[in-house]
A protein has these predicted regions:
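Thiamine diphosphate
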Residues: 82-89, 228, 242, 281-282, ...
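Active-site diphosphate/adenylate-binding microenvironment
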Residues: 1, 6-12, 220, 317-392, ...
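Receiver (REC) domain switch-region micro-motif
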Residues: 179, 246, 355, 406, ...
Length: 515
C-alpha cells in the first residue's frame, strides 16, 4: 500500500524484477506475501508508507515473528533533519518494530547494500522471522551502488563426541520412542532424512499444526497433529508420558496450548531436543539439547545404530490404539455442522488442495481432521493465532500456484476482518475458494465464556449475507445448509474462472465436545 514516501522504493522494486502487488490493507498484504512464501520459500517483502501505513502492518509483522516467517519490512520515513521540525505522521518506527522483529535498521545511503544483505540474512538464518528497514526519502532517492558482498552461508553442524555417543545409546535402547516434530523442519531440507530416520528406527511421531504433512499423514507411524485441542491431548499426552525416549525434532512450542508445558519428565525419560535456536522458552526441558542441522543430526544419530524391525518398538501397540482413538474422536460422518463441513470438503476437494485457516474453533477442528500429504499444505497462524489471515493467505497462494485448488477456511468474524481483499482477488483475476463458517458468533470465545459460566457478552453478532459479498466484488457466492449443497457449491467453484465465497450456515454451539 504505497504512500508518497515510498514511491521511489516501489518503482525500484519493479525495475529490479520484484513484482509489486497492491492490497487493500497492509496487514493483508503481508499475509498475501506469506502465502507466496509458502510456495517459493523466498522472504516476504512488505512495503508500507510512514505512520499509519507502517502501523497497519504491525499485526502481520508480529505474526511473522511468532510464526517464524522470513520477511523484510520496508517502511518509508522522513529524513532526520526534516523530522527535527516536521511532526505530521512522524514517529519512531524503529522503536515500534524492534520488539516484534529479529532486527530493525535505519537505512543509510552509504551502507544500503550491506544493510540490505544483512536484513535478508538475518530473516532467513536460524529461526526465520521479520527484519525491519526504515527507509528515509533521501536514501530511497539516492543512486544505488554495486558492491560485491562475499558472504559465506552458515555451515551445517552435527553433534559429536560423548553427546552423540549418549544419544545413540538412548536410541538403540529405546523400547517406546516418540518423536515430536515441529515447524523448524520446514526451513531445512528435512523431509527425506526425517522419513528415513523415523522408519529406520520405527519411531511414531506427532507433528505440530504447522509441520503437518512433512510426511504424509497416512503414514503408519504418523499420529497426526497436535496444538490446541484438549480433546486430542486426552489421547496424545498419556502416550507422551509413557514414552521412554522423546525426540523433539525442530519442535517450537510456541504453537502449543499450556497442556504441553512440561509434557515429559527428563528425570525419568530420556529427552533429546534438536532445534534451530537455544531453549529460552522453558516450556519444556531435555537431557540433551542440540542446536544443529536437523538432517545432519539425524544422519549422525543413525550412523552405527542398527535399524529396527517393523513393530520392534511399542510392543503393546499403544500408538496404533491412540491413532484409532483419535480417528473416533474426530469422525468424518457427521451430517452437518463444522465437522460435517470439513468432512465434505475433504471428500469433494482434490487430495492435494492447498488450504489456509483463520484462527478460531474451526481451525482446531480442521487441523485435527484434515490429512495433509505434503509440507505447507495447510498454512495458518499458529504462533500469534491472529484472525483475518486465511483469506489473504489464500490469495497469495493462488497467485503463486494458479493451477492448484486453493481454499481458505474462516469464521464469519475473521472473514469480515479481511473481506475488502475480495476486491484484490477480483483485480488479480484469481479463483480461490473462500469457505466461511457462519454461526454469527466468536465460537471459540463463546465456548470458553460458557465453560466459565459467564454471561453471554460481546461474542455474538448478526448473521450477514457472505454469498452476496462475493457476488458484489465480482466473484461467485453460494449459501449452503447441508452437505449436498456444499458439494455442489465446491464443484462449481472448482470449475469457475473467478473466486467463490461458500457461506456454510451452521448452528451456534456446533463445536461443543468437538475440539
Amino acid at each position: 500500500m504505497p504512500g508518497g514516501e515510498v514511491l521511489t522504493l516501489v518503482d525500484a522494486l519493479e525495475k529490479a524484477g520484484i513484482k509489486v502487488h497492491l492490497a487493500k490493507h497492509e496487514n493483508c498484504a503481508g499475509f498475501m506475501g506469506e502465502g507466496v512464501h509458502h510456495t517459493d520459500g523466498a522472504p516476504v517483502i512488505l512495503v508500507a508508507t510512514l505512520g499509519p501505513g507502517a502501523l497497519n502492518g504491525i499485526n502481520v509483522v508480529a505474526n511473522a515473528h511468532q510464526d517464524r516467517v522470513p520477511m523484510v519490512v520496508l517502511t518509508g520515513c522522513v529524513d532526520a533533519a526534516e523530522a527535527a521540525t516536521y511532526t505530521h505522521q512522524v514517529l519512531n518506527q524503529q522503536a515500534v518494530f524492534t520488539p516484534i522483529t529479529k532486527a530493525s535498521f535505519g537505512l543509510d545511503a552509504d551502507a544500503a547494500e550491506v544493510i540490505s544483505d544483512k536484513a535478508v540474512t538475518i530473516a532467513t538464518e536460524g529461526r526465520n522471522g521479520p527484519v525491519h528497514l526504515d527507509v528515509p526519502i533521501s536514501v530511497a532517492n539516492a543512486p544505488a551502488r554495486e558492491r560485491n558482498i562475499a558472504r559465506a552461508p552458515a555451515g551445517k553442524t552435527a553433534p559429536s563426541g560423548e553427546t552423540l555417543t549418549q544419544a545413540r545409546a538412548w536410541l538403540a535402547a529405546a523400547q517406546k520412542p516418540l518423536a515430536i516434530v515441529g515447524l523448524d523442519v520446514l526451513y531445512q531440507d528435512t523431509r527425506a532424512p526425517l522419513r528415513s530416520f523415523l522408519e529406520t528406527h520405527q519411531i511414531p511421531f506427532v507433528t505440530t499444526y504447522k509441520a503437518k504433512g512433512v510426511l504424509p499423514e497416512d503414514h503408519p507411524l504418523c499420529l497426526g497433529g497436535a496444538g490446541l485441542s484438549p480433546l486430542a491431548d486426552r489421547h496424545l499426552l498419556p502416550l507422551v508420558e509413557d514414552a521412554d525416549l522423546i525426540l523433539s525434532i525442530g519442535y517450537d512450542p510456541i504453537e502449543m496450548r499450556t497442556g504441553w508445558r512440561d509434557a515429559w519428565d527428563p528425570a525419568r525419560q530420556n529427552v533429546l531436543d534438536i532445534m534451530a535456536d537455544p531453549n529460552h522458552h522453558y516450556m519444556h526441558q531435555a537431557n540433551i539439547n542440540l542446536i544443529a542441522s536437523i538432517p545432519e543430526t539425524l544422519a549422525a544419530l543413525s550412523e552405527g545404530t542398527a535399524p529396527r524391525a517393523q513393530r520392534d518398538t511399542w510392543a503393546d501397540n499403544k500408538p496404533a490404539a491412540v491413532k484409532s482413538a483419535l480417528a473416533a474422536a474426530f469422525p468424518q460422518d457427521e451430517a452437518w455442522g463444522p465437522a460435517g463441513v470439513i468432512a465434505e470438503c475433504m471428500a469433494t476437494l482434490p487430495a492435494n488442495t492447498l488450504l489456509s485457516a483463520d484462527s478460531g474453533a474451526h481451525r482446531i477442528l480442521l487441523s485435527q481432521m484434515w490429512r495433509c500429504t505434503e509440507p505447507r499444505q495447510l498454512i495458518q497462524s499458529s504462533g500469534l493465532c491472529t484472525m483475518g489471515c486465511a483469506l489473504p493467505m489464500a490469495i497469495g497462494r493462488k497467485l503463486a500456484q494458479p493451477d492448484r485448488t486453493v481454499v481458505s477456511f474462516s469464521g464469519d468474524a475473521g472473514f469480515l476482518m479481511a473481506a475488502g481483499e475480495l476486491a484484490t482477488a477480483s483485480e488479480e483475476g484469481l479463483a480461490p475458494i473462500f469457505v466461511v463458517f457462519v454461526d454469527a458468533s466468536l465460537a471459540l470465545i463463546e465456548l470458553k465464556q460458557r465453560q466459565r459460566q459467564l454471561a453471554n457478552t460481546a461474542v455474538d453478532f448478526a448473521r450477514h449475507d457472505f454469498a452476496a459479498m462475493g457476488r458484489a466484488f465480482g466473484g461467485n457466492g453460494h449459501r449452503v445448509t447441508n452437505r449436498q449443497e456444499l458439494r455442489a457449491a465446491l464443484t462449481a467453484a472448482m470449475a469457475a474462472d473467478t473466486f467463490t465465497v461458500v457461506a456454510c450456515e451452521i448452528d451456534r454451539g456446533g463445536y461443543d465436545g468437538r475440539i
